[in-house]
């Protein structure tokens, strides 16, 4: 059986370089291009890439995906900064390339994805819930895409269950003291030297609390999810948001 031809965009970054090694080590994949800033996107078509792993920046991702979709190249995207407007534009491009698949994953760690699903399942049973994400100080966005996605899943689960608004008697606070409000769920971001990527979901009810925590200790923790995404996206046309849809959790 022929190998799937894969390219990595953002190949010189920490996660990108790890992804290059992971693709090279996979028996069923062939690394055909490893592109960094300034490299020609035409290399993707020159090398016959069938799928890309997109790990660049919010400033570059739309141009890269536009090129990929115009040439029928599937994409697994870890780049953050997604807005409703950007997603709408991406769906417009996908309408013109209906057989092409795009996976956008706020987190490629399977443990982190499971943490999100556990929190979603638990949220309806507790009166209060808050999210704390902890990352290295070089991370440019806050809160993280994972924390935002977690809060959105929690909020949707609570709305479906008819949960009351969370109790909070705070009337005065310094700016940011109660975190960011994501659909009614407080999200707190910590940036600290020595950390990589960590998240806690704190749930509280009458006389008890539950803490759901995940820790990524090395960039290698993202590789099984990236490889799963590459293998599944080529048979999943359209936009898939969240790696959980490829884990058959339901």
From Swiss-Prot:
Enzyme class label: oxidoreductase
Annotated EC: 1.17.1.8
Signal peptide: none
Residues holding (S)-2,3,4,5-tetrahydrodipicolinate: 136, 145-146
Compartments it resides in: Cytoplasm
Record-level Gene Ontology MF annotations: 4-hydroxy-tetrahydrodipicolinate reductase; NAD binding; NADP binding; oxidoreductase activity, acting on CH or CH2 groups, NAD or NADP as acceptor
GO biological process, one term: lysine biosynthetic process via diaminopimelate
Chain sites annotated for binding NAD(+): 10-15, 78-80, 105-108
Keyword Transferase: no
Metabolic or biological pathway, per its Swiss-Prot or TrEMBL entry: Amino-acid biosynthesis; L-lysine biosynthesis via DAP pathway; (S)-tetrahydrodipicolinate from L-aspartate: step 4/4
Top-level division of the source organism's lineage: Bacteria
Catalytic residues (UniProt): 135 (proton donor/acceptor), 139 (proton donor)
Catalytic reaction(s) noted: (S)-2,3,4,5-tetrahydrodipicolinate + NAD(+) + H2O = (2S,4S)-4-hydroxy-2,3,4,5-tetrahydrodipicolinate + NADH + H(+); (S)-2,3,4,5-tetrahydrodipicolinate + NADP(+) + H2O = (2S,4S)-4-hydroxy-2,3,4,5-tetrahydrodipicolinate + NADPH + H(+)
PROSITE patterns: DAPB
UniProt entry tagged with the keyword Disulfide bond: no
Residue ranges of the region described as Disordered: 158-177
Cited InterPro entries: DapB_C (IPR022663), DapB_N (IPR000846), DapB_N_CS (IPR022664), DHDPR_bac (IPR023940), NAD(P)-bd_dom_sf (IPR036291)
UniProtKB keywords: Amino-acid biosynthesis, Cytoplasm, Diaminopimelate biosynthesis, Lysine biosynthesis, NAD, NADP, Oxidoreductase
Protein family according to the UniProt entry: Belongs to the DapB family.
Role of this protein: Catalyzes the conversion of 4-hydroxy-tetrahydrodipicolinate (HTPA) to tetrahydrodipicolinate.
PANTHER family: 4-HYDROXY-TETRAHYDRODIPICOLINATE REDUCTASE 1, CHLOROPLASTIC-RELATED, DIHYDRODIPICOLINATE REDUCTASE
Protein name: 4-hydroxy-tetrahydrodipicolinate reductase
């Amino acid at each position: 059986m022929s190998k799937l031809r894969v390219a990595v965009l953002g190949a010189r970054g920490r996660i990108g370089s790890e992804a290059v090694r992971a693709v090279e080590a996979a028996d069923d994949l062939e690394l055909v291009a490893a592109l960094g800033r300034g490299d020609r996107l035409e290399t993707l078509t020159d090398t016959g890439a069938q799928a890309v792993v997109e790990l660049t920046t919010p400033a570059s991702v739309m141009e890269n995906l536009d090129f990929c979709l115009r040439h029928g190249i599937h994409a697994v995207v870890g780049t953050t900064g997604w807005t409703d407007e950007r997603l709408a534009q991406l769906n417009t491009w996908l309408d013109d390339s209906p057989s092409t698949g795009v996976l956008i994953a706020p987190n490629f760690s399977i443990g982190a994805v499971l943490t999100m699903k556990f929190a979603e399942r638990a949220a309806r049973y507790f009166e209060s819930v808050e999210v704390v994400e902890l990352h290295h100080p070089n991370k440019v966005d806050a809160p993280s895409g994972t924390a935002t996605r977690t809060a959105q899943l929690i909020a949707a689960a609570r709305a479906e269950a008819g949960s009351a608004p969370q109790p909070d008697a705070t009337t005065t606070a310094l700016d940011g003291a109660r975190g960011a409000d994501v659909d009614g769920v407080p999200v707190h971001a910590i940036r600290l030297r020595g950390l990589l990527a960590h998240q806690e979901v704190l749930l509280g009810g009458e006389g008890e609390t539950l803490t759901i925590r995940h820790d990524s200790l090395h960039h290698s923790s993202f590789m099984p999810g990236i490889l799963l995404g590459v293998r599944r996206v080529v048979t999943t046309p359209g936009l898939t948001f969240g790696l959980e849809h490829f884990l058959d959790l339901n």
